[in-house]
Design a protein with these regions (language model features):
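Phosphate-coordinating loops and pocket residues in cytosolic domains that bind phosphorylated ligands
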Residues: 9, 74, 82, 109, ...
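N-terminal DNA-binding recognition helix of tyrosine site-specific recombinases/integrases
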Residues: 9-59, 103
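Short, basic (Lys/Arg/His-rich) helix/loop patches that form interaction surfaces
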Residues: 11-18, 26, 82, 86-90, ...
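C-terminal catalytic core of tyrosine-transesterase DNA break-rejoin enzymes
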Residues: 31, 49, 95, 99, ...
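Hydrophobic (often cysteine-bearing) scaffold residues that line and stabilize catalytic clefts
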Residues: 32, 36-39, 73, 89-90, ...
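Short pre-functional
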Residues: 38-45, 91-105, 121-122
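Flexible interdomain linker/hinge and immediately adjacent N-terminus
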Residues: 49-81, 209-212
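Conserved tyrosine-mediated DNA breakage-rejoining catalytic core shared by Y-recombinases
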Residues: 76, 110-192, 202
């Protein structure tokens, strides 16, 4: 029971902690703690048989609690989009999020080649996350599509383009006509910048990127939206 309590108080690592004060980092969710508990219980019988423990702990697994998210009305979404018209990248990101129910890590990883403008659809096939140097060593190479260079040499993490955590996250999304038009304008802007910068442009094939082609950190995108 003490170990379960410890897990509930343990701060998250990875993309949920980067760029945040210690007080802002969330603790492990009930779902994550439940998974840890299930893994531990699988080994109790073997541990007893090998005399690592004298008896199997009689503990009750933690309950999972789900937070209900309040859905925004179409009127509220339209109002928000109107307020951020002067920021094309943020506007397109928010438009994509609401139209396709995308997470931030999926938005900043959209592959231009996965978009079918004639059909009005796109495939969600990868995510972009900030990964610590230590965690990168243990990450399966099969899941990694691309590791981006560090912007600062003394940084202890870097952005990584990788496959989704589950097969269910790989999916096809359909786009509304206004969103298709906005994506067309974005791609035209990217092509224009490519011509202007030439070899200095970092072409990563990503729809939501910085002016010179570098990827956008999802934490910065979320921060821009909150502001």
């Amino acid at each position: 029971d003490g170990f379960i309590d410890y897990l509930f108080q343990k701060p998250c690592r990875g993309s949920k902690s980067y760029g945040k004060r210690a007080s802002e980092v969330p603790t492990l969710s009930s779902g994550t703690v439940k998974k840890c508990y299930n893994i531990l219980t699988l080994g109790f019988e073997t541990a007893k048989r090998w005399n690592y423990i004298s008896e199997i702990p009689n503990t009750k697994g933690p309950s999972e609690h789900y937070k209900k998210r309040k859905a925004w009305s179409s009127e509220h979404i339209s109002k928000i989009l109107d307020q951020i018209q002067d920021d094309p990248i943020l506007h397109l990101s928010v438009h994509l999020a609401f139209n396709c129910s995308l997470r931030a890590g999926e938005i900043v990883a959209i592959d231009i080649n996965s978009i079918n403008l004639n059909e009005g659809s796109m495939w969600i096939s990868q995510i972009l996350e900030r990964v610590s140097d230590e965690s990168l060593k243990t990450l399966s190479k099969e899941k990694i599509a691309k590791v981006f260079p560090k912007q600062f040499s003394n940084a202890k993490s870097r952005l990584v383009l990788k496959t989704p955590k589950t097969e269910g996250s790989l999916r096809k999304q359909y786009l509304t006509r206004p969103l298709v038009q906005e994506i067309k304008e974005r791609i035209a802007e990217i092509n224009k910048t490519k011509e202007l910068l030439g070899p200095e442009y970092q072409d990563n094939g990503i729809l939501i990127c910085q002016s010179e082609g570098r990827p956008v950190d999802q934490n910065k995108l979320c921060k821009s939206f909150k502001e």
